[in-house]
Amino acid sequence: MTNLSGSMPSSTAADLQPALRVEGLGFYYGTKKVLEGVTMAIPVGKVTAMIGPSGCGKSTLLKAFNRIAELEGRVKVTGKIEFFGQNIYDQKVNINSLRREIGMVFQRPNPFPTSIYDNIVYGVKLCCNVSRAELDEIVERSLTRAVLWDEVKDSLKKSALGLSGGQQQRLCIARALAVNPKVLLMDEPCSALDPISTLKIEELINSLRENVTITIVTHNMQQALRVSDYTAFFNTDESRIGQLVEFDTTQNIFSSPQETQTRDYVAGRFG
């Protein structure tokens, strides 16, 4: 169990240890209900996509996983989210430690207005007492994992703001990887990128999956098919506010969904 002081979609997934387990989750911003009765589990070492129309609560769930949603205002949580067996909303949980263990990459690249090098080491310096040599190793390793090292190794002291949009997003991924998270959350990481940069991010996701559990929110159905092992479909209408409609292997969600709403959504009939 990680020290920070849902049911599975198929028999195959049930054999996998969950990195995150959600049980009966309800989530409110103030008095506004955003999620209701969500139960699911994110298996370790897999990529899980969350899809659904705008406003269905998928990004809110992503932000609930590392409690960053609390930065957006007063929230109320019912039910439970466990991270390797520990309730992340327990009063004993250190939120900063949780956010190191569960990193996040946002829709638009958000590099700090500092050098490429300082972007990578920022989180490491906050949590750890390491030497300059160790920092240098972390920078190279993180940028290499993000498939960016060869492009920036001679420009580490230059501003990160001078990078292209795709490079900035890979830098943000490298920055998250620098503190060795167990889980990486991605909220539509390619929505602001061109097709070539999107391809590089998708290739990066595939290269990271063996070492980091990844959960990605995407509106791109083809992207979900390309990069994910499991897919969760959320929907919102007059009768279902922010509810999980179906969770299964990505292959099953797109080829043989069990719910009519899922079938209509992946076929492009709404959303």
Swiss-Prot record:
Which keywords does UniProt give here?
A: ATP-binding, Cell inner membrane, Cell membrane, Membrane, Nucleotide-binding, Phosphate transport, Translocase, Transport
Residues given in the record as ATP binding sites:
G52, P53, S54, G55, C56, G57, K58, S59
How does the entry describe its membrane topology? Peripheral membrane protein
Location(s) in or outside the cell: Cell inner membrane
Q: Which SMART domains match?
A: AAA (SM00382)
Membrane-spanning regions, if any? none
Name-wise, this protein is Phosphate import ATP-binding protein PstB 3
Q: Which organism is it from?
A: Synechocystis sp. (strain ATCC 27184 / PCC 6803 / Kazusa)
